[in-house]
UniProtKB/Swiss-Prot annotation:
Sequence intervals crossing the membrane: none
Subcellular locations according to the entry: Cytoplasm, Cytoskeleton, Cilium axoneme; Cytoplasm, Cytoskeleton, Flagellum axoneme
GO cellular component, one term: microtubule
Organism whose genome encodes this protein: Oncorhynchus mykiss
Protein name, UniProt field: Dynein heavy chain
Keyword annotations: Cell projection, Cilium, Cytoplasm, Cytoskeleton, Dynein, Flagellum, Microtubule, Motor protein, Repeat
Task performed by this protein: Force generating protein of eukaryotic cilia and flagella. Produces force towards the minus ends of microtubules. Dynein has ATPase activity.
Subunit structure, interactors included: Consists of at least two heavy chains and a number of intermediate and low mass polypeptides.
Length: 515
């Protein structure tokens, strides 16, 4: 600084004692030797006084001034600059970058979750539409089978009517038997139609609708709960980020105090205060680190609990789906039993018809031979119709109902399994994304902390080196200035001594002349 050596006191060479020449004895200038002795005395006194004053006073003043100015100003400037640069810029940059990265990670997780939920819903809708299409196709098959049965009944009715028209005056009893058998067949067909329609409506439509609706509702609840767990994990991450920021701030404050302590080692008088501050910071940082570890452990426990809840919910969905499938299988088995019972009724009706026709033929064989031929022909028609009915019913039952039920069960199992597997993959991927984001944020925070601490340490080392350079330069300048002052003082003393000697000689000569 330009003002360092401009404050030399103006009284440095004006403090020569006023009694220096007032205490000269009257007999001092009686001889030349006394004048020389007095001059030597003046030179010794002035030289000693100037050297002591200039050397000690100037060195003490300049050294103290340089140390105070360089130490205080450099420490204040370097500390303030380090605090402003490292604390504000590093913290602003690290917090801004971490917040931006966390926002991007959270937005990506939300996008993945929305896409997975939308994909599951679309796939479930496609499965439901395909199941409805299969059910509609099965309904068309059953309707076609009903039309075949109605046509067979129409053929039977027409053949029976034709036989009755040709043998109406011969066998009235057979007409009653055939009418009764026709009513039995119609009732059996009605039972079959009712049982088939009821089984299809109840077992396929209601069970599939109930199971799919319940699975979708439960999957939506599981997904909502997973979203709630993800939101809670995000809150835990935000709280961890807050704790990390708080710990970073305390680490930076601790680094600043360590730098102040390393700089203020020169001043021994405040060593105790720095040691107490260091002890308090170490104690607070230890507790902050322990608290951060506790928060991280708690967040890990929360994530483990979320995984446990997701596993339990998935297991509950699988168990409930298995229960629904078992109940559907029981309903299908009951429907098969009803169909088998209807088949037995039809077979019994056919047996009654055959027995009644045979009995009528035996009672009327010697009365109407032509009627026998007609009846035989009608019997063949009826047998053929019965065979067609049996074949159509068995074929419809075996092909349409059984295959449709098996295919529907297969589609339901495949859709439920695919939805569960896809949900598990989505949940695993979400957990992986969350774990990766947490790990990446922690690693990036550690990297930012390490980089900021390293930058602060490097900057502090540069400040200390600059302070040492300033102190060395100040001491060198003080030494040069002291040498210059000493040289100037010696020159001034010599000039002043010569002036005193000249004045003394002149005074002696004047005294000698007057004597």
């Amino acid at each position: 600084p330009s003002m360092l050596f401009s404050t030399v006191p103006s009284t440095l060479f004006s403090t020569v004692p006023s009694t220096l020449f007032s205490t000269v004895p009257s007999t001092l200038f009686s001889t030349v030797s006394s004048v020389i002795q007095y001059s030597i005395h003046v030179i010794q006194y002035s030289t000693l006084h100037v050297i002591q004053y200039s050397t000690l006073h100037v060195i003490q003043y300049s050294t103290l001034h340089v140390i105070q100015y360089s130490t205080l100003n450099v420490i204040q400037y370097s500390t303030l600059h380090v605090i402003q640069y490292s604390t504000l810029h590093v913290i602003q940059y690290s917090i801004l970058h971490v917040i931006q990265y966390s926002i991007h990670v959270i937005q990506y997780s939300i996008h993945v979750t929305q896409y997975s939920i939308l994909h599951v819903i679309q796939y479930s809708i496609h499965v439901i539409q395909y199941s409805i299409h299969v059910i509609q196709y099965s309904t068309h098959v059953i309707q076609y089978s009903i039309h075949v049965i109605q046509y067979s009944i129409h053929v039977i009715q027409y053949s029976i009517l034709h036989v009755i028209q040709y043998s109406i005056h011969v066998i009235q009893y057979s007409i009653h038997v055939i009418q009764y058998s026709t009513h039995v067949i119609q009732y059996s067909i009605h039972v079959i139609q009712y049982s088939i329609l009821h089984v299809i409506q109840y077992s396929i439509l209601h069970v599939i609708q109930y199971s799919i609706l319940h699975v979708i509702q439960y999957s939506i609840h599981v997904i909502q709960y997973s979203i709630h767990v993800i939101q809670y994990s995000i809150h835990v991450i935000q709280y961890s980020i807050h704790v990390i920021q708080y710990s970073i701030l305390h680490v930076i404050q601790y680094s600043i105090h360590v730098i102040q302590y390393s700089i203020h080692v020169i001043q021994y008088s405040i060593h105790v205060i720095q040691y107490s501050i260091l002890h308090v910071i170490q104690y607070s940082i230890l507790h902050v680190i322990q608290y951060s570890i506790h928060v991280i452990q708690y967040s890990i426990h929360v994530i483990q609990y979320s995984i446990h809840v997701i596993q339990y919910s998935i297991l509950h969905v699988i168990q409930y789906s298995i229960h629904v499938i078992q109940y559907s299988i029981h309903v299908i088995q009951y429907s098969i039993h009803v169909i088998q019972y209807s088949i037995h009724v039809i077979q019994y009706s056919i047996h009654v018809i055959q027995y009644s026709i045979l009995h009528v033929i035996q009672y009327s064989i010697h009365v109407i031979q032509y009627s026998i031929h007609v009846i035989q022909y009608s019997i063949h028609v009826i047998q053929y119709s019965i065979h067609v009915i049996q074949y159509s019913i068995l074929h419809v039952i075996q092909y349409s109902i059984l295959h449709v039920i098996q295919y529907s069960i297969h589609v339901i199992q495949y859709s439920i399994l695919h939805v569960i597997q896809y949900s598990i993959h989505v949940i695993q991927y979400s957990i992986h994304v969350i774990q990766y984001s947490i790990l990446h944020v922690i690693q990036y925070s550690i990297h930012v902390i390490q980089y900021s601490i390293l930058h602060v340490i490097q900057y502090s080392i540069h400040v200390i080196q600059y302070s040492i350079h300033v102190i060395q330069y100040s001491i060198l300048h003080v030494i040069q200035y002291s040498i210059h002052v000493i040289q100037y003082s010696i020159l001034h003393v010599i000039q002043y001594s010569i002036h005193v000697i000249q004045y003394s000689i002149l005074h002696v000569m004047i005294l000698a002349c007057s004597m």
